[in-house]
C-alpha cells in the first residue's frame, strides 16, 4: 500500500537535522513528562521512534483514505442547510480517519491531551495532508489556531478549549470582512460588553472565513467605541455551542472545493475575551497569521509534491514518436525544474519551522518559569531573540516562495500532460485550481514582500546569507565550516557571486532614498534573497544526503543564478523616473 511518509524519504531527512535534537530536548523539557505519562518518551531516541510511528500512520491515512476521496470531495463540496454548513460526505470520512489516528492537538502539551510534538513534525504531517487533498488540509490544519489561544488565553480557557481540539473539534479564525481584507485594521465587527451576563456580544459580518462553521472560532472584533484603527481591536473566542452565528452563504470558488469558505452573520453572539483588550490585531493576529503563513508554506509544498508526482507518472507512461515523453529534453527539463523548486521550497519550509520551534518553545518555557517566579537565563533569552528574528524574517519568504512555486509547478504539471491535462479526468487540473489561492490567502505574495522588506533594506538577509556561506546555517554558530562537500564547492562559489550582486542591488536601492521606488523593486530583491538562501540550503542538504538532493542542488543553483541575473539587471537599470511609465 502507498504511504506518503515512507514513500518520500525527503520528509524524513529533515527530521535528522542537527538542530532537531536541541528542539526536541527543549520541547520535552529534558523528558520531564516520562514520570507523568506512560506514553511520554524517555529520551531522544524514544521520542524519534514515537514521531516515526505517528508519521507512518499519518502517511497511511493520507495515501489510502484522504487522497482517494479528493476527487469526490472536489465534485460534491459543502452545502448549506438552515444556515448551517454541511461538509461533503467524504470529508466526514476524512475527519473520522484523522481523529481515529490521533492526528489532532499535535503541538499541544500532554496535560491537555495533545501529542506535544514540535513544529517540524507537525509540518511534516501538514505537508502530507496537503499532498492528499489541499482543501481538506485547510480544515485539518486550522487546529493550529489553538496555538494562539494556548499562548494568549488564560488557564481556564486552555483547560476548556485545548482538550476539545485535541479530541478533533474544528477551528476557524474569523478575521476578514467585506471591507477589510488585507487591511485588517478596518475591521468593524462590533464587540460590546454585556454586564448582566458578564460576557461580550458580537454583532456584524465576516467574509471569506475558511471552515467558518467550525466548533471554536477566534474572532477579531472592535471592542473600543469610537476607534477606527488597529488599536481598537481585540481577540475573542466564540463557541458554536453558544449559538448566535449564521452561515449566510458559501463562496463558489475556483478551487479547494472541499474547504468551506463562509460568510458569517454574528447576531448578538456570546463570546469571551482572549488576552488583553486592544491587542487583537497588533499582537495576537500577527502571531496567528505567522503560524497560518507557515501552514500555507507546508500546504504549498504538499501541492507541489502531488503535482510533480502526477507529472512524473504521466511522463513515464505517455509515449509519443515511439518513446516515453520523459525522454524528450523539453519534458525532462520541466520535470527537473519542478523537482528542484519542490526540494528548495521544502528545505526553506523546514528551516523556518526549526526557527519557529526554538523561539516558541523558549517563550513557553519562559511563561512556565514566570508562573513560579523564575525566568530564562541570559543565554536562553539571547537564543530566543535570535531565533524569533530569524523566524520573523524567514516566514514571509517561505510562504511567498513556496506558494509561487506551487502555482508554477501545477502549471507545468498540466503542460507535461499536454491536452490531457486540460481534461477533468486528470488530477492535475484540480491541483492547478487548488494552488491558485495559495499565493493569495493569509497575505498575498505582494504582502509577503512588504513583511520581508525591512529585512532586505536593513541588511539582515545579507547577514543570513553570509552566515550560511560560512557554516551552512544561520546563525553561523549553529553550523560548521566544513558544511559543504567538496563536490558542491563550485555551487557555493556561485552563491557567493550571487550574494555580491544581491548586496550591490540592495545598496543601490537604499541609495535612491525613495520609498516608492523601493516598494516598486522590492519583489526583485525579495526573490534574489530567497533564491540564494534556498540554493545554499539545498547545497547543505546535498552535502549530507547526495542520494536525495544531488540533482536538485545542481539544477536549482543554475536556475537561481539565471534568476539573480534577471532581477539584478532590472533593479540596476531602473530609477524613480521610470515609475511614471507604470502608474495608471
Predicted features, each with a name:
Residues 1-81, 85:
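Extended, charge-enriched "interface" segments that sit outside catalytic cores
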Residues 2-5, 9-10, 19, 256, ...:
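Alpha-helix capping/hinge segments and adjacent helical runs
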Residues 36-39, 241-244, 248, 260-292, ...:
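A glycine-rich, basic-preceded beta-loop-alpha segment at the flavin cofactor/substrate interface
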Residues 59-60, 89-167, 210-212, 346, ...:
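Internal helix-loop-helix
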Residues 91, 459, 475-584:
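C-terminal amphipathic alpha-helical interaction region
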Residues 154-160, 444, 450-499:
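A structural-propensity feature for long, helix-poor, extended segments
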Residues 199-245:
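A short core secondary-structure module
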Residues 343-399, 506-520, 539, 543:
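C-terminal helix-coil-helix/basic helical segment that borders enzyme active sites and/or dimer interfaces
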Amino acid at each position: 500500500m502507498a504511504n506518503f511518509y515512507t514513500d518520500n524519504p525527503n520528509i524524513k531527512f529533515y527530521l535528522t537535522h542537527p538542530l532537531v535534537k536541541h528542539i526536541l530536548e527543549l520541547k520535552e523539557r529534558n523528558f520531564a513528562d516520562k514520570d507523568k505519562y506512560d506514553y511520554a518518551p524517555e529520551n531522544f531516541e524514544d521520542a524519534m521512534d514515537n514521531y516515526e510511528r505517528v508519521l507512518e500512520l499519518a502517511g497511511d491515512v493520507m495515501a489510502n483514505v484522504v487522497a482517494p476521496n479528493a476527487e469526490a470531495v472536489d465534485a460534491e463540496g459543502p452545502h448549506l442547510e438552515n444556515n448551517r454548513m454541511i461538509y461533503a460526505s467524504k470529508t466526514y470520512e476524512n475527519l473520522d480517519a484523522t481523529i481515529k489516528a490521533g492526528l489532532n492537538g499535535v503541538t499541544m502539551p500532554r496535560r491537555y491531551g495533545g501529542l506535544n510534538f514540535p513544529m517540524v513534525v507537525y509540518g511534516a504531517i501538514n505537508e502530507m495532508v496537503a499532498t492528499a487533498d489541499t482543501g481538506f488540509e485547510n480544515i485539518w490544519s486550522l487546529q493550529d489556531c489553538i496555538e494562539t489561544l494556548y499562548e494568549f488565553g488564560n488557564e481556564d480557557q486552555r483547560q476548556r478549549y485545548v482538550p476539545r481540539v485535541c479530541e478533533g473539534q474544528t477551528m476557524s479564525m474569523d478575521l476578514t470582512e467585506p471591507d477589510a481584507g488585507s487591511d485588517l485594521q478596518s475591521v468593524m465587527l462590533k464587540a460590546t460588553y454585556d454586564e448582566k451576563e458578564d460576557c461580550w456580544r458580537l454583532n456584524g459580518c465576516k467574509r471569506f472565513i475558511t471552515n467558518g462553521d467550525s466548533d471554536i472560532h477566534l474572532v477579531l472584533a472592535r471592542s473600543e467605541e469610537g476607534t477606527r484603527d488597529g488599536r481598537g481591536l481585540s481577540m475573542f473566542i466564540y463557541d458554536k455551542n453558544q449559538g448566535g452565528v449564521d452561515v449566510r452563504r458559501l463562496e463558489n470558488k475556483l478551487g479547494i472545493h472541499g474547504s468551506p469558505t463562509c460568510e458569517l452573520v454574528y447576531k448578538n453572539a456570546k463570546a469571551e475575551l482572549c488576552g488583553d483588550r486592544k491587542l487583537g490585531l497588533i499582537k495576537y493576529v500577527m502571531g496567528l497569521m505567522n503560524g497560518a503563513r507557515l501552514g500555507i508554506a507546508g500546504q504549498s509544498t504538499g501541492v507541489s509534491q502531488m503535482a510533480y508526482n502526477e507529472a512524473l507518472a504521466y511522463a513515464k507512461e505517455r509515449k509519443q514518436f515511439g518513446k516515453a515523453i520523459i525522454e524528450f529534453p523539453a519534458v525532462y527539463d520541466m520535470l527537473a525544474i519542478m523537482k528542484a523548486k519542490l526540494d528548495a521550497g521544502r528545505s526553506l519550509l523546514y528551516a523556518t519551522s526549526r526557527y519557529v520551534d526554538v523561539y516558541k518553545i523558549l517563550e513557553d518555557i519562559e511563561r512556565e518559569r514566570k508562573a513560579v517566579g523564575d525566568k530564562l537565563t541570559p543565554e536562553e533569552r539571547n537564543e530566543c531573540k535570535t531565533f524569533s528574528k530569524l523566524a520573523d524574517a524567514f516566514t514571509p519568504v517561505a510562504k511567498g516562495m513556496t506558494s509561487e512555486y506551487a502555482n508554477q509547478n501545477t502549471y507545468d504539471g498540466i503542460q507535461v500532460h499536454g491536452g490531457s491535462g486540460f481534461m477533468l479526468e486528470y488530477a492535475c487540473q484540480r491541483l492547478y485550481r487548488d494552488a491558485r489561492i495559495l499565493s493569495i490567502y493569509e497575505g498575498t505574495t505582494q504582502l509577503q514582500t512588504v513583511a520581508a522588506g525591512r529585512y532586505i533594506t536593513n541588511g539582515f538577509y545579507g547577514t543570513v546569507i553570509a552566515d550560511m556561506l560560512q557554516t551552512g546555517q544561520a546563525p553561523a554558530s549553529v553550523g560548521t565550516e566544513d558544511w559543504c562537500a567538496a563536490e558542491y564547492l563550485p555551487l557555493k562559489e556561485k552563491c557567493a557571486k550571487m550574494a555580491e550582486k544581491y548586496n550591490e542591488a540592495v545598496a543601490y536601492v537604499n541609495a535612491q532614498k525613495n520609498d516608492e521606488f523601493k516598494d516598486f523593486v522590492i519583489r526583485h530583491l525579495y526573490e534574489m534573497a530567497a533564491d540564494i538562501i534556498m540554493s545554499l540550503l539545498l547545497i547543505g542538504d546535498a552535502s549530507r544526503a547526495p542520494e536525495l538532493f544531488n540533482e536538485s542542488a545542481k539544477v536549482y543553483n543554475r536556475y537561481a543564478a539565471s534568476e539573480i541575473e534577471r532581477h539584478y539587471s532590472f533593479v540596476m537599470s531602473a530609477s524613480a523616473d521610470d515609475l511614471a511609465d507604470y502608474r495608471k
